[in-house]
């Protein structure tokens, strides 16, 4: 399955805990059955806040740039500062924000692409149809929380309980023979993108990896905990909770064991939180065989993009970190021999207004990804 089809067909989490016990051998045996060449994964990067992507991808051709500059006024980037992209679309050449040099190189090498004016849509519409209230619009349009859900669930007209990443793993039950929770791994805690009907997600810390239960280094605490877990007189609700907790503990053991075998990357990563998360994802991808998975989703949030003011200044600070993290991750995938097997994509709450509010830009609808 190629990456485009893998994404197209896509259209609850456990607690990260570990216990200082031996990992069940049966879990490790099943985890070694996956051939690396069959591996495929997608990495969803949420630019939380609503990134002003009209200053990430900018028209360079004279007429188109002049229209862009007229609409953006004080938010417009200098035409001479844009990083040129090879090729053109409908006679228009484009460039990237000057901070996106790594993305420029990948695009010009045919290893990256931009999707323009993309966002949740129930049905084709026009401004006139919207003004006449003649069409159905996505739920909660312009609302941060609503539009993040619309993106992650790919259900613009209803409030679905599952995300398209979770549904993707649900649809491939035979692909992952090892640890079920390893199909969806989050570096940013709970999210709707990875919520499936039959599968959940597992949260791992970028810096600390699998987090152990507080107190497990104390023998008395550990014995007391194990005694509670073995209590056969528990109620039905207690039993369900105990089983879920034990599954999380067992999963933590498997993840800890697998991560101890992760490839030591020679690719240098920056030390900011986003690059640290991308490095951890690369390490996790390197142990997919140990985890027994051939199809995975990863999720990470890079927040702080709600730039109602100082858009140019804040983007000049944040876009280099985004570009570096994505670029370093791709280099690490090449080092691992997985560059053609992992697809990374960005989503954001919504696009921004083309016009300036005098300080920055406000909530919009479609944007560039």
Please place each PLM-identified region on the residue numbering:
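Feature for exported/extracytoplasmic and membrane-associated proteins, marking the mature portion
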Residues: 1-335, 368
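Metal-dependent active-site segment of extracytoplasmic phospho-/sulfohydrolases and closely related
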Residues: 326, 333-358
């Amino acid at each position: 399955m190629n990456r485009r089809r893998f994404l197209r067909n896509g259209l609850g989490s456990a607690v990260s805990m570990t216990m200082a016990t031996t990992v069940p051998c049966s879990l490790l045996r099943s985890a070694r059955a996956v051939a690396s060449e069959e591996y495929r994964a997608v990495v969803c990067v949420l630019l939380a806040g609503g990134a002003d992507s009209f200053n990430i991808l900018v028209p360079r051709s004279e007429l188109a740039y002049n229209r862009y500059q007229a609409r953006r006024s004080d938010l417009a980037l200098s035409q001479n500062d844009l990083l040129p992209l090879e090729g053109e679309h409908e006679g228009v050449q484009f460039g990237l924000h000057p901070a996106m040099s790594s993305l420029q190189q990948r695009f010009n090498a045919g290893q990256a692409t931009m999707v323009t004016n993309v966002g949740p849509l129930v049905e084709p519409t026009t401004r006139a149809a919207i003004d006449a209230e003649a069409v159905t619009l996505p739920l909660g349009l312009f609302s941060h929380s609503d539009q993040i859900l619309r993106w992650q669930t790919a259900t613009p007209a209803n409030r679905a309980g599952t995300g398209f990443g979770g549904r993707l793993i649900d649809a491939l039950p035979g692909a992952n023979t090892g640890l079920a929770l390893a199909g969806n791994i989050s570096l940013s805690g709970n999210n709707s993108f990875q919520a499936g009907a039959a599968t959940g997600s597992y949260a791992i810390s970028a810096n600390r990896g699998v987090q152990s239960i507080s107190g497990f280094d104390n023998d008395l605490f550990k014995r007391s905990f194990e005694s509670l877990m073995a209590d056969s007189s528990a109620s039905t609700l207690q039993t369900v909770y105990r089983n879920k907790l034990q599954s999380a503990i067992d999963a933590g053991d498997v993840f800890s064991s697998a991560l101890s075998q992760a490839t030591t990357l020679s690719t240098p990563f920056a030390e900011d939180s986003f690059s640290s998360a991308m490095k951890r994802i690369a390490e996790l991808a390197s142990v997919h065989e140990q985890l027994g998975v051939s199809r995975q989703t990863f999720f990470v949030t890079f927040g702080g993009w709600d730039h109602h003011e100082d858009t140019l200044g804040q983007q000049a600070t944040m876009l280099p970190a985004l570009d570096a993290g994505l670029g370093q991750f791709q280099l690490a995938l090449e080092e691992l021999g997985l560059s053609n097997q992992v697809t990374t994509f960005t989503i954001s709450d919504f696009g921004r207004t083309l016009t300036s509010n005098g300080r920055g830009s406000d909530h919009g609808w479609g944007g560039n990804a």
